Every structure is written in structure tokens, then in C-alpha cells.
């Protein structure tokens, strides 16, 4: 089967080479490279990332990887993806299987095809600028209308991330205005449509790359579909930023953007209590340092050892605080055991409740107090209970007790002193209470 597939691909490649190039309109002025990628160096085979570096880049929380360091052997990776898509190793539902089947129908692109599509995308963006200047319409509106005419209005409504999604009426109005342009400007409309079609083709041909990367991040707090969705956003960003003149393989370039989009989504959405992205990077670095020290020492490193390895500005207290932030929250309703008849919260002690020993002692003390106070009059016993907080745990003032009985505060003081003298005089009544003081 593999040989027949390779023969078909070879025959298809020959057909592409034999076809005469389509006559293109007058070339547009060259665009300037994206500002945030100006410093990207030319790829050097001797500087390709080594295997340990690639393992670090694969860390699900590593957001620090430089763009030029993420040069992977993408040809082998994409061949593996083509086989893995039919039988994904992760748990999937029917919508995921259907999605994998659909994207598996799009053939992979050669380097020459990627460059050709990227060139058309770039020319299309420049053409949209020209149309915006000529018509006064917003560039984003023109781009979305052109996209809607290619994909269909129903599909454009489902595209996530658009600030304003044009309705069918707006699409037809703007499209009619664009079609009524002079002949010399219609050339730009044709180029813009070709650029949008090339953009869509470049995205669809690399959707399997997103799936391959997203599978490495399962179990991190986001569902598989959410990971794919976030990775697709990174892929779209990569298409917009790709510079074909540097002759990078697009899958190599897009890998960094896809990982970054997934990593940021995990940092923002996966936790119940959100942690800032910069703190996620710090936690990731701290975890790598702790793992490295554990391998070197053969034991769990102390906070002081980790702080020393982290460098200036770190101490044991900061290490401890950072590790506490990294802890995952656990629901009190999490089932425990195979039968799942108990919950995690059932095994957490309530620090506000007394221990069984303290509760038993408190019960015995209450009984002895009742016996001692039973020898006093009802009013004297109630005054002592209110003044000493034996009823509600709060010691009431003389004014409060006086208001309760409808007498003055001085009269309450007299009743209290008389009751205490009775208890002190009859020591046999209070002897057992003294045992609770020890």
C-alpha cells in the first residue's frame, strides 16, 4: 500500500511539473518583512536543535523557546502524522474522528508549493491594501468579504476570532462595489481572491500538523478539541507571519506558533485559578531545575539547593512560594476509592472543631458546672452564666445583664458577688471543677 501511495505521489508531482505556469498579472511591489521577525537568521544545518533541546521545546509549559531554535525534522514528522491520523492514540469522540478524516484528505505540500502559496498570500494582502486606498473601505472588511465569497457566507459566520462578522447583505453590497471598480483596479480584486484561496489552502494542508502537536498536550486541563482549536489559531497566525523568501519549510516555522498558542491557552484556561503567563514560565523553569538536581543528587533537592541553582534573586522562601502556586486545586467532591462512595472532602479534618478528647472534656465540664450552679437560685445562676459566657460563649456586660433582668448594673454586680461567695464557701461543690484547671 505504501509503495502504491508513493507512486501516486510521484506521478502527481510529475504532472505538476509538466503543467505550464499560469500567466500572472503584473507583479506587485515587494513587501517588507514582518517587523517582529526581522532578526530571524537564515537556517544553518550545523545549528539545528539537538535532541535534548527538542525535548525542552516539547515541554507543555515552555513559552521561552526562540523562534529560530525550533527547527525540527518536519518531513519525517509529517509522514508519521499521515499514518497516525487514521488511528489516533488519544481518546476521541465522533466529531474528532470526522474532523481527522476530513483533514486527512488534503495532501501535504512540497517546499515549492508552500513558497508559491505564501507568495500569493503576500501579494493578496498587498492587493487588499490597494483596494482599501482606492475605495475607502476598511482592509479587514474587504478581506472578510473576499473570504466570504470564496468560503461561502455560512462558513464565514463560523470563523472564530473575527471582530465583526459581515452578514450576507453586507457581503453582497461590498462585493458589488468591488465588482464595479475600474478595470485596472479589478486586477487587484483578482489577486486578493487568489491570495485568500492560497491562504485557505496553506492552512488546510497543515491542519494535521496541529493535531500531531495537540496530542502531546492532552491531560493538561483542556479537551482535545479545545487544544486543536487553539493550535489552529496559532497556525493561522503563522500563515500571516510566514516569510517565504527565507525558504524555511512552513511546517518548521508554524510549529513554534502552534505550540505558543496551545501553551498560552493552557496557562489562561486550564486552571481554576488563573496564573499569569510570566509566572507559568517561572514555574516551568523551576520544575526543570528541580528535576535536573534530582537526577544529579539522586534525591529530592532542598529549597536552598534549588534556589542556589536558580541563580541571583532566589532564596528558599521564594522557591517554596512558587511551588505552592504551581499546585493544582482539587475538588472536595472528588470521588475516592473504586466504589466512589466517599469524597475527598470527607477525609479533610475541620480545624475549627475540637478533637474528640476536647469534646468529651467539655461535655464533662458542662455537667459539673450545672451541678455546681444548681445549688444557687435561678436568678443567681443565670447572672453567672451570662457574665461568664456559659450560654452563648460571649461574656455580657453588667449593663446588658441588667437590661435583661430589668434592674441596674449595680444590682447585677451585687447578685454576681453573692453567687460567687456561695460557691467559694461551699468548696465541696467546686472541688471537681478544679480538676479541669490542671
From Swiss-Prot:
Residues 1-11 have a biased composition (Basic residues). Residues 12-26 have a biased composition (Basic and acidic residues). A motif (Interaction with polymerase core subunit RpoC) lies at residues 226-229. It holds the Pfam family Sigma70_r3. It is found in: Cytoplasm. Keywords: Cytoplasm, DNA-binding, Sigma factor, Transcription, Transcription regulation. Residues 27-45, 52-69 have a biased composition (Acidic residues). Residues 202-272 are annotated as: Sigma-70 factor domain-2. CDD domains: Sigma70_r4. Residues 372-424 are annotated as: Sigma-70 factor domain-4. Interacts transiently with the RNA polymerase catalytic core formed by RpoA, RpoB, RpoC and RpoZ (2 alpha, 1 beta, 1 beta' and 1 omega subunit) to form the RNA polymerase holoenzyme that can initiate transcription. Sigma factors are initiation factors that promote the attachment of RNA polymerase to specific initiation sites and are then released. This sigma factor is the primary sigma factor during exponential growth. This is RNA polymerase sigma factor SigA. It comes from Thermus aquaticus.
